[in-house]
Amino acid sequence: MLAQRTLKSLTKAVGVGLHSGQRVELTLRPAPPDSGIVFRRVDLPEPVDIVISPEAVTDTRLASTISSGSAKVHTVEHLMSACAGLGLDNLIIDITAEEVPILDGSASSFVFLLQSAGIALQDAPKRFVRILKPVEVREGEGANVKWARLSPYEGYKLSFEIDFDHPAVDSTGQRVEFDMGSGGYSRDIARARTFGFTKDVEMMRANGLALGGGLDNAIVMDDYKVLNSEGLRYNDEFVKHKILDAMGDLYLLGKPLLAAYSAFRSGHAMNNKLLRELQAHPEAYEIVTFDDEKSAPKGFSTLPRAW
């Protein structure tokens, strides 16, 4: 049986929120089978649980925010991407503020954190959402068009194309495809950092955003070049970060996908819209399990083994 996965033990991290600049503590705990991934705001007078789902997403400006009532957690996508890359199904995430810490601006610190806690197999089958028919969302026309699509595929692969009119971005790859079957998430995707432009930072900070951002947790560019002294981690780091984000946004479905995701100029809003469009068409998907893990698509049968 291809089994559900959780952590072997709890693990903790401390950091600051990218947009809030607030100090925040994370405690990641094992969770029972079929409980899913739950963010728990433990700083409130009464702790509030926020279970991940497309409907829990209430804001997609610059990041993905999930809510339950008035309780919110911002910028969940990098941690969710790490959970997707490691195949974690069940997890309780205690958080002491309303934004996940940015750490180094990628998912690699979360991957290290989760792997250091160890991964435990559980006595319940892993449930996948297998796409049976294409589902697409699209906005704009001509030069302003953007779209995202899920298509049938016996595995999980993502392709993304960006279109930034900037010298530093133009000189890198603007299209990339990643297949979970490669087993290379930690090596090829997780280290890609979020990025921004100095011309936007002042405006964002005036609006109370990017207060925790800097050269140690983002790629920062002026009108011509990357300002980080160490340069880029990948030649195509910008578009690889978009794949990283998409994996995190799509994992808010609550189950791993068996699908080919493709997108052009998509972002958090369109990724969430795509999940809601999928849910609106139950004939477009089915829930499947694998009694024999060897029959599972490559990339899931070969996820990092439990420690």
From Swiss-Prot:
Organism lineage string: Bacteria, Pseudomonadati, Pseudomonadota, Betaproteobacteria, Burkholderiales
Catalytic activity: a UDP-3-O-[(3R)-3-hydroxyacyl]-N-acetyl-alpha-D-glucosamine + H2O = a UDP-3-O-[(3R)-3-hydroxyacyl]-alpha-D-glucosamine + acetate
Role: Catalyzes the hydrolysis of UDP-3-O-myristoyl-N-acetylglucosamine to form UDP-3-O-myristoylglucosamine and acetate, the committed step in lipid A biosynthesis.
Pathway: Glycolipid biosynthesis; lipid IV(A) biosynthesis; lipid IV(A) from (3R)-3-hydroxytetradecanoyl-[acyl-carrier-protein] and UDP-N-acetyl-alpha-D-glucosamine: step 2/6
The gene coding this protein: lpxC
UniProt keyword terms in alphabetical order: Hydrolase, Lipid A biosynthesis, Lipid biosynthesis, Lipid metabolism, Metal-binding, Zinc
EC number of the protein: 3.5.1.108
Name of the protein in question: UDP-3-O-acyl-N-acetylglucosamine deacetylase
Gene3D superfamilies, per database record: lpxc deacetylase, domain 1, lpxc deacetylase, domain 2
One annotated GO molecular function: metal ion binding
EC primary class: hydrolase
InterPro entries: Ribosomal_Su5_D2-typ_SF (IPR020568), UDP-acyl_GlcNac_deAcase (IPR004463), UDP-acyl_GlcNac_deAcase_C (IPR011334), UDP-acyl_N-AcGlcN_deAcase_N (IPR015870)
